[in-house]
C-alpha cells in the first residue's frame, strides 16, 4: 500500500465553506476533499450542503468517520490530491494515532466557546485542544495557524 497524497489537513470548525472551496483547494491544488467527522459522515443534509461547494468548484468530496478514514485513506489512487478537513484537533490526533502520515496541519477556525482562550484572531483553544495540537506537532507534523493562504503562518504556543 502506498502513502496517500495528502496535501494538507485543515482544522476548521465550519468544515467546508466558500473559503475552503475556493481559496485553499485551488491554492494547494487538491482535487479531492475528505471531510473527517463522525457526525457529518452520518448526516445526509450536511453532506448535501457541503457537496454543493464541491460541485460548484469542481472537486470531489467524501465524508468519512475517523475510523473509516484510518482504514481506507491508504487505498487512495495516486492521482488523488487530498485535502483533509477536520472539525477539531482531537480528530486530527486520532488520525495520527491511527497511523496516518500527515505532513502539514493548518489550524484555520476554532470559534470561541466557554472555557476557550484566544491564541490568534480566529483560533480559540482549551487545554485539551492545546494538548492535542502539541501531540501532533511532537510527532513531526508541521502545525501552524493560517486563516487564508496569503496570511503569515503563526505557530502554536508551547
Swiss-Prot record:
It is found in: Cytoplasm. Disulfide bonds: none annotated. Its EC number is 2.7.1.-. The keyword Ligase does not apply. It is an enzyme of class 2 (transferase). Pfam families: PTSIIB_sorb. It comes from the Bacteria. The active site is at residue 17. CDD domains: PTS_IIB_man. InterPro entries: PTS_IIB_sorbose-sp, PTS_IIB_sorbose-sp_sf, PTS_IIB_sorbose-sp_subgr. One of its GO terms (cellular component) is cytoplasm. Keywords: Cytoplasm, Kinase, Phosphotransferase system, Sugar transport, Transferase, Transport. Residues 1-158 form the PTS EIIB type-4 domain. One of its GO terms (molecular function) is protein-N(PI)-phosphohistidine-sugar phosphotransferase activity. GO terms for biological process: phosphoenolpyruvate-dependent sugar phosphotransferase system. The EIIB domain is phosphorylated by phospho-EIIA on a cysteinyl or histidyl residue, depending on the transported sugar. Then, it transfers the phosphoryl group to the sugar substrate concomitantly with the sugar uptake processed by the EIIC domain. NCBIfam families: PRK09756.1, PRK11425.1, pts-sorbose. The phosphoenolpyruvate-dependent sugar phosphotransferase system (sugar PTS), a major carbohydrate active -transport system, catalyzes the phosphorylation of incoming sugar substrates concomitantly with their translocation across the cell membrane. This system is involved in N-acetylgalactosamine transport. This is N-acetylgalactosamine-specific phosphotransferase enzyme IIB component 1. It comes from Escherichia coli (strain K12).
Amino acid at each position: 500500500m502506498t502513502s496517500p497524497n495528502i496535501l494538507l489537513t485543515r482544522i476548521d470548525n465550519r468544515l467546508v465553506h466558500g473559503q475552503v472551496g475556493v481559496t485553499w483547494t485551488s491554492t494547494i491544488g487538491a482535487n479531492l476533499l475528505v471531510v473527517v467527522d463522525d457526525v457529518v459522515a452520518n448526516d445526509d443534509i450536511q453532506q448535501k450542503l457541503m457537496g454543493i461547494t464541491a460541485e460548484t468548484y469542481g472537486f470531489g468530496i467524501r465524508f468519512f468517520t475517523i475510523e473509516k478514514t484510518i482504514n481506507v485513506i491508504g487505498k487512495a489512487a495516486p492521482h488523488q490530491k487530498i485535502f483533509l478537513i477536520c472539525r477539531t484537533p482531537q480528530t486530527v490526533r486520532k488520525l495520527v494515532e491511527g497511523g496516518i502520515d500527515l505532513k502539514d496541519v493548518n489550524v484555520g477556525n476554532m470559534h470561541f466557546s466557554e472555557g476557550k482562550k484566544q491564541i490568534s484572531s480566529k483560533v480559540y483553544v482549551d487545554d485539551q485542544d492545546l494538548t492535542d495540537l502539541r501531540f501532533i506537532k511532537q510527532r513531526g507534523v508541521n502545525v501552524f495557524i493560517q486563516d487564508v493562504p496569503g496570511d503569515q503562518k503563526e505557530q502554536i504556543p508551547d
